[in-house]
C-alpha cells in the first residue's frame, strides 16, 4: 500500500487500515511548481510515493517523479516548500 494509491478516492470508501496508513506516513519533501496560471504542489512521502495537488481545484492525485521531471523540463518554476509540510 502507498499513499499515492489511496489519495483522490472518496473518503467514505477508505478502509480503516487505509485511513490509518495515510495518516501515519510522513512527507519527506514538498515542492510548488508554477507556470502561468498552473500551480501544483508535489509531495514525496517516506513510502516513496508522490502526490500532486492542484492549487485551483484542491484535487490531490497520485503522481510520479517522472511527472515532476517533465514539468521541470517544460519550464515550470520550482520552489522547495518542504519546511511548510514537515514538522
Tell me the role of every PLM-derived stretch.
Residues 16-87:
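Acidic, low-complexity, intrinsically disordered interaction modules
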Residues 2-22:
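Negatively charged, low-complexity tracts enriched in Asp/Glu with abundant Ser/Thr
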